[in-house]
């Protein structure tokens, strides 16, 4: 079953609070990939608090070079090295030289057998990447073509594996419908203002993790000039991208708590389902 585990290690932005640290999200998928989305100050300690070794990370995906998103990276790299790991970092091109001086492997994208991660340009005040995750979740079967096959064979074929039944090898494409393969997508924006060009580039997603630095008490023009979004901006993005789930992070320290964001979220008729997590909250998402 395609299942994502998201642990919100830091849900604040720019200035930390005692209960709201700087941006960092741990993502673990059902295939075993472990990805840290941004590395705010203290990210390695927060990983350890939730039982994840920095050395076990598949990747760190950094959205841009502002300090609140990267100050946790040097310590994480050093700790991982001591533990025998090697950190690979996805980052915008403008950050590559600086990151290489840390001794990390720097990548522009990632491609494995069933997961692809690509940079999508967002609308911030500096060079910045949103990170688009696309999972290959297997074949959608044509039930007429698959008639008579045992359940175990159907399970393997759906996952993209060939099977042998009564001496005959059956490949997934032999019993696939015209739609062929199925994909599920998640987009993590990092910092961004409203960004129609990004929506057009991406198309549709299942899950959107979008910043909502401000609720509804700041003029939208001011937020946009700073390269940030309001609650309404994030909701507009989710609807443009046809997201089923919208998760709001990067909440300004001007808010003592997240009650206003949650009041606004409660007024939204799904889709999308809107979540405003606290630090250390865990969200399981079935794709």
Swiss-Prot record:
Zn(2+) 1 binds at residues 64, 66, 124, 191. SUPFAM superfamilies: Metallo-hydrolase/oxidoreductase. Coiled coil: none annotated. The active site is at 68 (proton acceptor). InterPro entries: Metallo-B-lactamas, RibonucZ/Hydroxyglut_hydro, RNase_Z/BN. Its EC number is 3.1.26.11. Keywords: Endonuclease, Hydrolase, Metal-binding, Nuclease, tRNA processing, Zinc. It catalyses: Endonucleolytic cleavage of RNA, removing extra 3' nucleotides from tRNA precursor, generating 3' termini of tRNAs. A 3'-hydroxy group is left at the tRNA terminus and a 5'-phosphoryl group is left at the trailer molecule. Binds 2 Zn(2+) ions. Zn(2+) 2 binds at residues 68-69, 191, 250. Its cofactor is Zn(2+). It is an enzyme of class 3 (hydrolase). One of its GO terms (molecular function) is 3'-tRNA processing endoribonuclease activity. Gene3D superfamilies: Ribonuclease Z/Hydroxyacylglutathione hydrolase-like (3.60.15.10). Zinc phosphodiesterase, which displays some tRNA 3'-processing endonuclease activity. Probably involved in tRNA maturation, by removing a 3'-trailer from precursor tRNA. Homodimer. Belongs to the RNase Z family. This is Ribonuclease Z.
